[in-house]
């Protein structure tokens, strides 16, 4: 089933665009001017200069002091396909300059970077290279400075003309799966890009499900429901968008003949895994979790919360399980395939999903379990030990213990009152320090003896810690290597 979205708006005409796109292929790079990790204050010589107001246009051969070392800006050239190896500016920055004959709006499409500065304006990055970052930038007449912090893997960037003054970016949409025979409303989140220099007004979003009639909705508020009429059955899809409009003078109607964006919506049967969208009470955004439903709809079943590993989508996590006759399985997103290791906002997302799903499925809260693999195994430890009242059992698989044991986090030795504050602020991440909370829980630990991704010592340390108060913690070991052992 297709969902078609179109945007009708009133806005003043934009000046003609100059020749775009422009691929960023030649610039300067500097390596080794940052030191991050799980520390309260990462070191960054370039960012320090930006904040201090001393950063200037770099020149080839120019030096930056970083501790006792001196780093040099070096010439940077992209490969034939336009990509730049991440190692070319690992732990550093890449700088490009783009000359424009006039002021204009462009869309920055970049991947593999931690963040960007365009003429000093900070912009979010796409560190894992998903390719969904399409950000409008206001280029000035003359030279424009583009500075990119290093991310993961290869980097590429280009400036493209906006397809319209306002357009949808569907590459990062949060869309539901529709359930056969279900007329309940759903939520969807779609990014609307404003490629102008002013707030827009008079916006109307038109939605149409394949085979149904179109519905127009004005968007004067931050959140707007949109009605969609399906083909054989009536369904409604609520579209969440954030936009504050202000009146504009001298507005002219604008209509685009470009192809309307279409979003693919899956229609799933009652026993199939599916995406369930909801409106988050944390920040008002649309989020989803994946549901692997039990083999029948009887209420009062157990609920399994499954936390995914790094780079795994929640729907893929749910698909990895066979359906259970006795339990529904729910996989939250962590707000992204990487998120923050199920801590902080990842923790909040998991707890919100647990509550939403428990109510919706009428779960037996005395039979709520948490499991997860790799990063999700850490999530199972972290959630299960931090909230032992919510889970009657936990089953971490190939899970690491904490930032201090696995992810390179540094413990701050209290020496002053301020240092002590930061040390205590890190206590929620000290999973091993919470292990006694498992004294009333059932715990099953699964780990590979030769796991070359998460060392088996992580499981053994938790087994010893849990065993200090109890002697019935089972640990299953597989004498194989690789992060997916025992999955």
Predicted regions, residues:
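Accessory carbohydrate-binding/adhesion or oligomerization-edge regions at the termini
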Residues: 14-84, 97, 149-177, 289-291
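Aromatic-lined ligand-binding clefts that engage carbohydrates, nucleic acids, or primary amines
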Residues: 100-117, 146-148
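A domain-start/cap signature at the N-terminus of enzymes
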Residues: 175-178, 212-298
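Gly/Ser-rich "nucleophile elbow"/oxyanion-hole loop immediately N-terminal to the catalytic nucleophile
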Residues: 295-299, 343-375, 385-391, 437
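Short beta-strand element of the alpha/beta-hydrolase
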Residues: 299-310
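Mobile cap/lid helix-loop segments that gate and shape the active-site cleft of serine hydrolases
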Residues: 309, 392-435, 440
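Short beta-strand/loop motif that positions the catalytic acidic residue
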Residues: 438, 444-447, 451
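C-terminal catalytic histidine-bearing segment of alpha/beta-hydrolase fold enzymes
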Residues: 450-452, 456-487
């Amino acid at each position: 089933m297709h969902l078609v979205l179109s945007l009708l708006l009133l806005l003043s005409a934009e000046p003609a665009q100059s020749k775009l796109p422009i691929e960023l292929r030649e610039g300067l790079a500097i390596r080794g001017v940052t030191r991050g990790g799980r520390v309260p204050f990462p070191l960054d010589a370039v960012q320090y200069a930006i904040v201090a107001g001393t950063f200037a246009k770099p020149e080839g051969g120019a030096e930056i002091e970083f501790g006792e070392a001196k780093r040099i800006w070096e010439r940077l050239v992209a490969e034939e396909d336009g990509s730049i190896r991440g190692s070319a500016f690992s732990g550093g920055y890449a700088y490009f300059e783009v000359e424009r004959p006039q002021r204009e709006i462009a869309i920055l499409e970049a991947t593999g970077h931690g963040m960007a500065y365009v003429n000093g304006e900070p912009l979010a990055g796409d560190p894992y290279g998903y390719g969904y970052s399409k950000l409008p930038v206001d280029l000035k007449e003359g030279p424009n400075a583009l500075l990119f912090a290093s991310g993961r893997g290869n980097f590429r960037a280009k400036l493209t003309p906006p397809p319209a003054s306002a357009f949808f970016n569907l590459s990062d949409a949060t869309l539901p799966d529709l359930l056969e025979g279900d007329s309940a409303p759903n939520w969807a989140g779609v990014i609307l890009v404003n490629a102008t220099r002013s707030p827009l007004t008079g916006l109307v979003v038109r939605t149409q499900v394949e085979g149904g009639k179109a519905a127009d909705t004005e968007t004067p508020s931050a959140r707007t429901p949109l009605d969609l009429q399906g083909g054989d059955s009536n369904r409604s899809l609520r579209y969440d968008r954030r936009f504050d409009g202000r009146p504009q003078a001298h507005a002219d109607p604008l209509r685009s003949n470009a192809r309307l964006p279409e979003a693919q919506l899956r229609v799933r049967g009652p026993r199939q895994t599916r995406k369930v969208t909801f409106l988050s009470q944390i920040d008002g955004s649309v989020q989803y979790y994946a549901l692997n439903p039990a083999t029948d709809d009887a209420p009062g079943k157990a609920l399994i919360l499954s936390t995914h590993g790094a780079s795994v989508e929640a729907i893929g996590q749910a698909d990895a399980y066979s359906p259970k006759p006795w339990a529904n399985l729910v996989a939250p997103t962590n707000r992204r395939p990487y998120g923050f290791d199920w801590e902080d906002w990842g923790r909040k997302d998991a707890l919100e999903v647990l509550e939403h799903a428990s109510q919706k499925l009428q779960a037996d809260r005395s039979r709520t379990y948490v499991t997860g693999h790799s990063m999700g195994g850490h999530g199972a430890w972290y959630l299960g030990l931090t909230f032992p009242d919510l889970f009657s059992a936990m089953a971490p698989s190939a899970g690491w213990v904490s930032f201090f044991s696995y992810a390179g986090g540094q413990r701050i030795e209290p020496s002053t009152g301020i240092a002590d504050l930061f040390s205590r602020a890190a206590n929620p991440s000290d999973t091993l320090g919470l292990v006694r909370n498992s004294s009333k829980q059932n715990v099953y630990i699964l780990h590979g003896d030769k796991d070359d991704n998460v060392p088996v010592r992580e499981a053994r340390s938790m087994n010893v810690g849990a065993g200090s108060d109890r002697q019935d913690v089972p640990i299953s070991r597989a004498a194989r290597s690789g992060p997916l052992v025992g999955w």
